[in-house]
Amino acid sequence: MLISACTTEDRKKETAMTKEKIFKIISDAEDAFGLAHQGDDLEKIKKTALDFHALVHPAEVSGTKEKTIADFVFDYMATGHQNDIVPRQDYDVDLKYAGTNAVPLCWHFWHTYRIEDLVSNILMSNGKQIFNDEWKEKIGASITDTGNALEYDEAVSFGKSINVPNLRRYMIAVGKNTREIINGLTLEQIKTKVPEEWVMRILEEGGVTVDFRSVWLLVFWGRLTVGGMLSIPITDHHMMHLTPCVNNLPIEF
């Protein structure tokens, strides 16, 4: 019995997720998508994009049974930590095109999913974004844009009003919708840049502000093909913001 118990315990340790294991799995998925994106195999591009997308979104988005890095961070936030202050990113970068470099934890989720909503629906499919006045009220958001240009006091104030359960509902809606969009893409779309008028819709609909620390996003996105958007911001952008949360908070895996 002792040997059996030890064996079972050892197996649990071997299969238990750690931050390092999760980061390695995600890194491998990113590499697989990057390699596929260089080619013309449409189904492989979409599959690797969806695999990568699944790993950096809550498990409910893709229907996977195992918790993802997004689940671990969100679950921590949902236990009264939405206003924990964390770095905006974990690498050395010039933030002259940004507001505060320290933000409430909930800002990271707002920022990444507002951007995913705008890019996937308006730029990748010329459709209608999910966010509207009803979602704004449910989430308790004081803004409609991505929050790029918020100063520290503004970001702190923003975080205090956020309804975490409804923010999660918005995240799930955005993530599931993005997967449908990815499944419907053609190779021609993936290899093509989008019209300028689509890009300008984001400003017209309040997705960015006229502050240069916000509006520069339009220039950046306008230079990307749809395939490029599948990386930044649909997948890799999430890891850019989940990583500082994991590295600077006592989140258990």
Predicted regions and their residues:
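N-terminal export/membrane-targeting signals
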Residues: 1-7
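Aromatic-glycine hotspot motif
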Residues: 6, 13-106, 115-253
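Conserved H-X4-D acyltransferase segment
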Residues: 109
